[in-house]
Amino acid sequence: MNVLRKIVKKCRDEDTQKPSPVSAPPYDDDLWLPPPEYVPLKELTSKKNMRNFCVNGEVKACSPNGYSFRILRHILGSFNEIYSGNHRMIGLVKVVVGLALSGAPVPEGMNWVYKLRRTLIFQWADSRGPLEGEELEYSQEITWDDDTEFVGLQIRVGARQCHIQGRIWCINSNSRACQLWSDMSLQTQRSEEDKDSSLLLE
């Protein structure tokens, strides 16, 4: 049985030997996620727990033999148990990681690099989420290694409250970006009154 674990092995940009060619993720519906879909906010009935965050995220995926999103979903499926950052921001981190991975990767040595820099508006349920003025600087390396393949994820997410106009993070059930986390702990509640906003339940 494959076991998810953190190990010492690192993603290296260069190899003193002949570097192994890195395969691009396959362009297959099951494996590849197109750019995320945003649902614009029309009307929000309550602004009590809504905050703008300037977020930047970077995910480096390292695998000498290429990788599929099936593996990434499997790794991220245990995110709640292995997340080492501020737990009041775990929902925000999940969204940023999911959006970053839904973008286009840039090759960098042995790595595929996904970056995201956006201003997003998040809303938390029942006064949960980060404290007023709280910021996040989170970085972690997560690796998957078994007898046949190795995949390493280096995740960095920064978030700070800001007052410039952002875009509402809303769940569109038809969006492939949203489906990345659909079988995980990130859940949303939507009512008819707030149908264009989303609550991150943590």
Curated annotation (Swiss-Prot):
Note: Most abundant protein in the virion.
Domain notes: Late-budding domains (L domains) are short sequence motifs essential for viral particle budding. They recruit proteins of the host ESCRT machinery (Endosomal Sorting Complex Required for Transport) or ESCRT-associated proteins. Matrix protein contains one L domain: a PPXY motif which potentially interacts with the WW domain 3 of NEDD4 E3 ubiquitin ligase (Potential).
Keyword Phosphoprotein: yes
GO terms for biological process, alphabetical: viral budding via host ESCRT complex
CC per GO annotation: host cell cytoplasm; host cell endomembrane system; membrane; viral envelope; virion membrane
Keyword Phosphoprotein recorded: yes
Lineage summary: Viruses, Riboviria, Orthornavirae, Negarnaviricota, Haploviricotina
Gene field: M
Membrane topology value: Peripheral membrane protein
GO molecular function: structural constituent of virion
Residues the record marks as site: Involved in the inhibition of stress granules formation and contributes therefore to virulence: 95
Protein source organism: Rabies virus (strain CVS-11) (RABV)
Motif PPXY motif: chain residues: 35-38
Protein name (record): Matrix protein
